[in-house]
A protein has these predicted regions:
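Catalytic-core regions built around general acid/base machinery
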Residues: 1-7
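Asp-based, Mg2+/Mn2+-dependent phosphohydrolase catalytic module
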Residues: 13-129
Length: 129
C-alpha cells in the first residue's frame, strides 16, 4: 500500500465505524491517506450514494476513483456509481476467478494479491503518464 500511496491517494471506504477502522488499521500496521466510514457518510455500501459521496469528499469525479475489493458486490456497486474497479483475490474472502479464468472481464484490474495490484497499477500509471 505504501508504494501505491506514492502515486495515488489511498482511502478506505468501509461499513465499519471510524474508530473500529482506525483500530484495525493500527493493529495490522496499515497506513491510509484517509478513512471514510459509511457511518459518517450517512449512506452504506452498496448504495451508490456511499461511493459518490466518498469521491465527492475527495474532490474527485466518480470516474477518477477506483474501488479495490475482494467482493464482487462491492465492485459491481462501485461500477454502477461510476467508479473504476480492481479485484484483489483474498483467500477465504474472494470468489474463485483465478482458478477458472485469467481475469474477470467486468473489472478494470484483476490481481492475485496486493503485490500484483501494486505492480499493475504502478505500471499502468507509468505507461499512461
Amino acid at each position: 500500500i505504501e508504494k501505491l500511496r506514492s502515486r495515488y491517494t489511498v482511502v478506505v471506504l468501509t461499513v465499519l465505524s471510524w474508530s473500529i477502522a482506525v483500530d484495525c488499521s493500527r493493529h495490522n500496521g496499515i497506513s491510509w491517506d484517509g478513512i471514510l466510514s459509511c457511518e459518517f457518510l450517512g449512506h452504506y455500501k452498496p448504495d451508490a450514494e456511499a461511493y459518490q459521496k466518498g469521491a465527492d469528499l475527495l474532490r474527485l469525479e466518480p470516474d477518477q476513483a477506483m474501488m479495490v475489493a475482494a467482493h464482487a458486490g462491492d465492485l459491481q456497486a462501485a461500477m454502477k456509481a461510476g467508479l473504476h474497479s480492481a479485484y484483489v483475490h483474498r483467500d477465504g474472502e474472494s470468489f474463485g476467478i483465478f482458478g477458472e479464468l485469467d481475469s474477470a472481464p467486468e473489472w478494470d484490474v484483476n490481481a492475485r494479491d496486493f503485490a500484483e495490484l501494486e505492480r499493475l497499477l504502478l505500471t499502468q500509471v507509468s505507461t499512461t503518464a
